Design a protein with these regions (language model features):
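Ribokinase/PfkB-type carbohydrate-kinase core domain
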Residues: 25-39, 51-174
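Substrate-binding N-lobe of the ribokinase-like
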Residues: 1-46
């Protein structure tokens, strides 16, 4: 969406040496997004989104080559000319990678936005996510389940209040 509005956007990731990886990279180019794509030995990842009649969604993910990405593959030049690093939470379990990404982004003056991705990921990485949010995250996105896992608050407004004390901008989605 940002690229379509004329905002310079880029994507950093790792895909396989396969036709799916080629497709992903070309799709980014076609959308006006600068691809900073690394190639791994594993197959390219995929995600299937299942949506029930009442709107509940379940994401079935195979991260594939994305799991091969390492922090030492990132450098400051990847962040040159950008204003914001948006972290999609499915790779948060790689603390070294995400830690390096946020440190580099902050060193380059970027805003850091984090989408928590899944309550399961929050549950498994709560300590690390708190450290990230306290030290680096400027914008945090969470749905109600993720916000509950992150804060312990069942009421979305109370969860939003707790999150907003940790970072400048908090968003709790339904």
């Amino acid at each position: 969406a940002m690229a379509r509005m004329g905002v310079r956007t880029g994507y950093v990731g790792k895909v396989g040496r396969d036709t799916t990886g080629d497709f992903f990279e070309q799709a980014l180019v076609n959308l006006g997004i600068e691809p900073h794509i690394l190639r791994g030995n594993e197959r390219s990842g995929r995600c299937v989104s299942l949506v029930s009649a009442d709107g509940e969604r379940t994401m079935c993910t195979f991260l594939g080559a994305a799991l091969e990405m390492r922090g030492d593959e990132l450098n400051e030049s990847l962040f040159d000319g950008y204003d914001c690093l948006y972290i999609e939470g499915y790779l948060v379990q790689d603390h070294e990678l995400i830690g390096r990404a946020v440190r580099l982004a902050k060193a380059c003056g970027l805003t850091v936005a984090l989408d928590l991705a899944s309550f399961n990921i929050v549950d498994e990485n709560l300590g690390f996510l708190n450290e990230l949010t306290d030290g680096y995250v400027d914008v945090l996105f969470a749905n109600e389940q993720e916000a509950f896992s992150f804060t312990g608050e069942r009421n979305p407004l109370e969860a939003l209040d707790k999150i907003s004390r940790k970072c400048p901008l908090a968003v709790v989605k339904r």
